[in-house]
Regions:
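Pan-zinc metallopeptidase signature
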Residues: 2-21, 203-295
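A general structural signal for short secondary-structure junctions and capping/turn motifs
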Residues: 25-28, 93-96, 118-119, 129, ...
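Active-site scaffold of zinc-dependent metalloenzymes
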Residues: 60-122
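Mature extracytoplasmic/lumenal regions of exported proteins
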Residues: 122-123, 137, 144
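Active-site recognition of the HExxH zinc-binding catalytic motif
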Residues: 127-140
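Short, well-ordered loop/turn and helix-capping segments at boundaries between secondary-structure elements
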Residues: 139, 143, 276-279
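Post-HExxH zinc-binding segment in Zn-dependent metallohydrolases
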Residues: 140-216, 220, 224-246, 267
């Protein structure tokens, strides 16, 4: 119990630090996301809600003020967990502990290291957990949840958009050029050049989105905007959660569209550009259910 509780508390402390330094409100109690931490033998549930406690036999193991950590038998048989979870299916209203209520599921550092090469350092594991924690934070905002449901993202998985990127030359060429405009704007210091880069990005994106609506699916555009906002901001949190920060030159997967799922990279770059331009977006993005490329 001691090791698991210590690691959970370290994650919560890091979350508070990132909230203070990078994203105000991330640790606000009204957006609290219950955490389920998996070991090889049991689960630790951090501030679970009543539906979870009614569904699984739980024993209170640790309490410190408002923080309560319970243990339960392992709640599923999956080998690895590192994701936010929320059910939006009305059929789950009476049965799912996460019905319209985001949770974070994460495996212990030991399980994570076994399943994901390159994650042996606990510090790297913490950045992964913070990334997923931020997804729960997003879905705890009613306006963002409404935007997600209205966008078509629930019908079109991000893998389908990545498939379009890999399959259609016009799609990939435009996405890569859009990202090149963002990266150039991040490098430049001349305001006029930055403005031209932003205009170039918007023109290319508008043309691609129009073609997506004609040739693919109208819902694909809304889904892309939601995933870009969701994953770009979570990658931004992960970036800032890394001790000392990631070396961008050595970690080009963070910002290149041809290495990771492209929405992660473009979203991450838009967030960094908004920071550079001094745009007040963090207090509005999820409260108002906005998309990054509309700011």
């Amino acid at each position: 119990d001691r090791i698991a509780v210590t690691r959970i508390c370290e994650v919560l402390e890091l979350k508070a630090q990132v909230a203070a330094a990078v994203w105000p409100g991330f640790d606000d109690p009204q957006f609290e996301v219950p955490l389920v931490y998996f070991t090889d033998s049991l689960c630790y549930a951090v501030n679970p809600e009543a539906r979870f406690l009614a569904q699984y036999p739980a024993t209170l193991r640790y309490r410190d003020g408002e923080l309560k950590i319970y243990t339960t038998p392992t709640i599923d048989s999956l080998e690895f967990h590192m994701q936010g979870t929320i059910s939006l299916d009305p059929a789950d209203a009476g049965s799912a502990y996460d019905y319209r209520s985001a949770y974070l599921l994460c495996s212990s550092p030991e399980i994570t290291a076994r399943c994901i090469p390159g994650t042996e350092e606990v510090a790297i594991w913490r950045t992964m957990v913070l990334h997923e924690y931020f997804h729960g934070f997003q879905f705890r905002h009613p306006a963002y949840l409404a935007q997600f449901e209205a966008s078509g993202a629930g019908l079109i998985p991000s893998s389908e958009l990545v498939g379009h990127y890999q399959r259609y030359g016009w799609y990939k060429e435009s996405v890569d050029r859009e990202n090149a405009f963002l990266l150039d704007a991040l490098r430049q210091t001349d305001a006029e050049i930055i403005r031209r880069d932003i205009d170039g990005f918007r023109k290319l994106r508008a043309e691609r989105h129009a073609r997506m609506r004609r040739e693919l699916a109208p819902e694909a555009v809304g889904a892309e905007r939601v995933y870009e906002t969701m994953e770009g901001t979570a990658r931004y949190i992960e970036f800032h959660a890394c001790p000392g920060g990631y070396d961008l030159d050595a970690n080009d997967w963070l910002y290149r569209t041809d290495i990771s799922q492209y929405m992660y990279a473009t979203g991450f770059n838009i967030v960094r550009l908004l920071d550079k331009l001094g745009v007040d977006y963090k207090t509005r993005l999820f409260d108002e259910g906005l998309a990054l490329d509309g700011l």
